[in-house]
């Protein structure tokens, strides 16, 4: 039985994960941490992260970027593996994640779904053929009107996958409104749509002369992210210090 601390337990994803874990015979949430104790939980909730002394095997984080620094310090102090699902981290925070991974196991993924992580592999193979042949690469992401960050962490992760396949020769453009020039050959455009209750949609476009190839992933429920986070927590518990991602979970 893997014992989990849920950081951001009163948020939507925290509640989704709590519901899923209740039905999981191999995992248990033993404590929650959130700025407000407004969730419907069967476990104790702490509004101050340092007040949580509950013994656990791993922590799952679905909170906000502003809480990331204190969270990482807390996990290092307790030698607690962390599944970091929060997006919108600054460059300084991303650097801190890498430093933290030298001390404890850290699994960071912008998107926890099996489908998205499979898509990342597919588009890398496509990029090696199509981008090399001169196809332009664009990403369009769509999310609900309440999402705070743009582009989404998943869109940036998809862009990173494309760029990695092309030896990091590309740069990203997410705003063309102030530019009066044609598209650069070595850019990956990223466009964001916000509206309604869209859970998450990501489209990767390879646009060539007289032909277009599109890869698309649509999330109909946030439960897919919760399931992935739980599987990641089970995988990470007991692992040595290091930087992990969902590819490690998928490969076992």
What would you call each of these model-derived segments?
Residues 1-5:
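Extreme N-terminal starter segment of soluble prokaryotic enzymes
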Residues 7, 12-50, 132-252:
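C-terminal substrate-binding/catalytic lobe of Rossmann-fold NAD(P)-dependent oxidoreductases
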Residues 29, 45, 82-83, 106-108:
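Hydrophobic beta-strand scaffold residues
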Residues 56:
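An anion/phosphate-binding loop that grips the pyrophosphate of nucleotide cofactors and donors
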Residues 59-60:
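N-terminal Rossmann-like NAD(P) cofactor-binding module of classical short-chain dehydrogenase/reductase
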Residues 73, 77, 86-106, 117, ...:
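Rossmann-fold NAD(P)-binding glycine/threonine-rich loop
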Residues 81, 96-113, 130, 135-136:
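Rossmann-fold dehydrogenase core element
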Residues 118-134, 150:
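Rossmann-like NAD(P)H-binding beta-loop-alpha module
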């Amino acid at each position: 039985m893997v014992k989990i601390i849920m950081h951001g337990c009163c948020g939507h994803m925290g509640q989704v994960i709590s519901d899923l874990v209740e039905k999981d015979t191999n995992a248990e949430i033993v404590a929650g941490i959130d700025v407000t104790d407004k969730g419907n939980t069967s476990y104790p909730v702490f509004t101050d992260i340092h007040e949580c002394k509950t013994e656990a095997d791993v922590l799952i984080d679905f909170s906000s970027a502003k809480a990331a620094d204190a969270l990482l310090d807390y996990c290092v102090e307790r030698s607690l593996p962390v599944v970091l699902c929060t997006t919108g981290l600054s460059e300084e925070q991303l650097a801190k994640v890498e430093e933290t991974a030298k001390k404890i196991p850290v699994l960071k993924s912008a998107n926890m779904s099996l489908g998205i992580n499979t898509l990342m592999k597919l588009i890398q193979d496509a990029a090696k053929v199509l981008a090399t042949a001169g196809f332009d690469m664009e990403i369009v992401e769509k999310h609900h009107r309440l999402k705070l960050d743009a582009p989404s962490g998943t869109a940036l992760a998809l862009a990173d996958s494309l760029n990695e396949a092309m030896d990091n020769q590309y740069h990203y453009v997410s705003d063309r409104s102030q530019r009066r020039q044609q598209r650069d050959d070595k850019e990956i455009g990223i466009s964001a749509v916000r509206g309604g209750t869209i859970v998450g949609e990501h489209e990767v476009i390879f646009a060539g002369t007289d032909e277009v190839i599109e890869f698309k992933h649509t999330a109909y429920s946030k439960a897919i992210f919760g399931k992935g986070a739980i599987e990641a927590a089970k995988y990470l518990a007991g692992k040595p210090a290091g930087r992990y991602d969902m590819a490690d979970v998928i490969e076992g």
